[in-house]
Regions:
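ABC transporter nucleotide-binding domain catalytic core, centered on the Walker B motif
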Residues: 201, 263, 394
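Short intracellular "coupling" helices and adjacent cytoplasmic loop segments at the cytosolic face
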Residues: 46-47, 82, 90-114, 118-120, ...
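Helix-loop-helix
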Residues: 48-52, 147-161, 231-305, 309-310
């Protein structure tokens, strides 16, 4: 929550102006039932056409002013929410870029993507709705009750009971559903994780003939999400019928008690209409407030998930030596009693071993699928930190060196080639920012990838 407030403080002006203009709009809205009441009692009651035109013009004026304030408030609220979402997303992306493979494996790529996109969108939507309604709805509810007491305090007593009953119903439904939304969000992560694992591991799944098992697992994950969404949806669906029932009972109470007072001459027909209009305003605003609280419950659940990522500290710090003394007799790379275990795994992927490579040597590492070849290479580039033992680069423990320095000295080619956004030339310049086209083509020839580029009409400009 403190983090969110920090983002809102960066745009404090628009954050304050949004609810302020909404309050002004609500103030004009509260006068509308009184104007309508006077039109009924005076204009229609006395057949005063001029008065009706005058009051009709006043209604139009109130509507135009209220609409202007509403549009202005929506603009400021949307601007504050978008700024907040943009800043939070940028900071989260920068924080995630500091993660090693260990943190990415621990949290899960699908979860990180979900929190970067869906969760921050939920927070952004929550901020937008909060700024628009968190002051307006309570102001209209209590303002309508106050205005009802100015019309007739006896008839307005039903407002107190109605608002109390509505508050109990809304509060009870929210108390039940808010924890459920957190479970739904967590289950969405499970479905995304299952989908991603199947897409990325499709070759292995087919190789071991595990399609049916994976289909059952996905069906289970999807079914659990469906059941949770249906369950919370059924409870939330009770909100509208219960609130409308309570409001209609309140209106019946007003008509019953007010009708008697009209017959006795204590109330006018216009005043009864005004009381009913105020009751309708309360209904609309309480439904809005309930929906706001539901949106906020989702937003807070998403904010908590985003904060969990911010709270996760990278295991590899971007600190260390960036220069070392090169010794002739020292191996360029050396593993000393090195072992590695993936997060959550029961067994070691790489058992303790010793290994050394001297400058100029060419060594191939062979092994079956899952034997640890890719893990071994990842440890060299320090994409992971070893579980035990040490890895030395030119006699210096890699943990004492800055990760950027290590990766600048080691060429790492992943098993699966990936092209990032931009042209082929932009991708090739990742290795050398000032590379010329001749140098790029020379590198493509060495990598035997020149044919792939030549097949494209745009050549290096292909996107």
């Amino acid at each position: 929550m403190k983090r969110l407030l920090g983002y809102l403080k960066e745009h404090l002006c628009v954050t304050i102006l949004a609810p302020l203009f909404k309050m002004l709009e609500a103030s004009f809205e509260l006068f509308v039932p009184l104007v309508v009441a006077s039109m009924i009692d005076v204009g229609i009651g006395h057949h005063d056409i001029g008065y009706l035109w005058k009051m009709g013009g006043l209604l139009i004026l109130l509507g135009i002013i209220g609409f202007s304030f509403s549009i202005t408030a929506q603009y400021f609220a949307a601007r504050s929410a978008v700024y907040t979402g943009k800043s939070m997303r940028s900071d989260l992306f920068a924080h995630m870029n500091q993660f090693s493979y260990q943190e990415i494996d621990q949290v899960g790529t699908s979860t990180l993507i979900n929190r970067m996109s869906n969760d921050i969108n939920q927070v952004q939507n929550g901020v937008n709705m909060f700024l628009r309604l968190f002051l307006r709805s309570p102001f209209v509810v209590f303002g309508a009750m106050f205005m009802a007491f100015t019309v007739d305090h006896k008839a307005a007593i039903s407002f107190v009971f109605t608002i109390t009953a509505l508050a109990v119903v809304v509060g009870l439904i929210l108390w039940i559903t808010m924890p459920m939304y957190k479970k739904v969000q967590k289950q969405v992560d499970g479905v995304l994780k299952s989908t991603r694992e199947n897409l990325l591991g499709i070759r292995v799944i087919r190789a071991f003939n595990r399609q049916r098992s994976e289909e059952e697992n996905f069906r289970l994950q999807s079914g659990q999400l469906y059941n949770k969404q249906i369950h919370v949806g059924k409870i939330s669906a009770l909100l509208n019928p219960l609130t409308y029932m309570i409001i209609n009972l309140g209106i019946i109470a007003i008509l019953w008690s007010g009708g008697k007072q009209v017959d006795l001459g204590y109330l006018t027909q216009g005043q009864i209409i005004a009381l009913i209009n105020y009751m309708s305003q309360i209904l609309v605003e309480l439904v809005k407030l309930a929906n706001l609280l539901i949106i906020l419950s989702r937003a807070f659940a998403s904010l908590d998930r985003v904060d969990q990522i911010f709270a996760l500290e990278p295991s590899m710090k971007e600190t260390g030596k960036t220069d070392i003394e090169e010794k002739k007799d020292t191996p360029i790379l050396e593993f000393k009693d090195t072992s590695f275990v993936y997060h959550g795994a029961r067994k070691e992927t790489i058992h303790p071993f010793d290994f050394a490579v001297k400058e100029g040597e060419t060594i191939g590492v062979i092994g079956g699928t899952g034997s640890g070849k890719s893990t071994f290479v990842s440890l060299i580039a320090r994409l992971y930190d070893v579980t035990s033992g040490r890895i030395l680069y030119r006699g210096v423990d890699e943990k004492e060196l800055k990760p950027e320095f290590i990766r600048g000295k080691i060429g790492f080619v992943p098993q699966k080639a990936s092209l990032f956004e931009g042209s082929l030339r932009d991708n090739m310049k990742w290795g050398k920012e000032d590379a010329t086209d001749e140098e790029i083509y020379q590198a493509l020839d060495i990598a035997q990838a020149r044919e792939f580029v030549d097949q494209k009409e745009q050549g290096l400009d292909f996107r």
